[in-house]
Amino acid sequence: VVHTLSREYGRRGFIVRPGKKAGMALFLPLNILEADVVENPKSELWSLRGIQVRDSLSGIRGSIRKNTMTLFLSEVLFRTLHDGAVEDGLYQWCIGSILTLNAMESDFANYSIRFLLEFAGALGFRPSFADIAPFTQDYAPQMRSMLECSFSESMLVPMSGQVRNSLCESALRYLEYHTDQTIRVKSLSVLRELYG
């Protein structure tokens, strides 16, 4: 079973039978795929056929740091979005975010934080500094910069790995508050290791 996000179906699980040629490489975190949906009238679990990678994402796949980020970001999407949830514009926002990360050649260490803040906006509750400040603990100035700077400027906000990790956790708590659910992201520990 592969979990997907699409314009038509929102978040949904599908049965897949990967061929010998491409195999599981098709299903790396945040891959952008094209496929034919095969509905099953006897089951709510449909299948995918003719699966192809729409974009090779070589800028992500060639970087251990970006691959680690995609593991974290895909888990955030999985834990936050419910099966069948269709949010207007969310699919296009995700595609744009993935392609942006793929295109970045340097200065992407703050990307996870910016992704989480923009994800909240895509879900309909874009954070203002006043809204997110109670979640930020000791790093309010850095969070303010992440919110108020342009995208390119926010990638250059200086911060240590500890600050980066804390801001990711703050953004996750903000998402939990607004989605009224606990978001347990196991890959957060991997991200912590990546940024020390």
Model-derived regions, located:
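Short aromatic-glycine-enriched beta-strand elements
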Residues: V1-H3
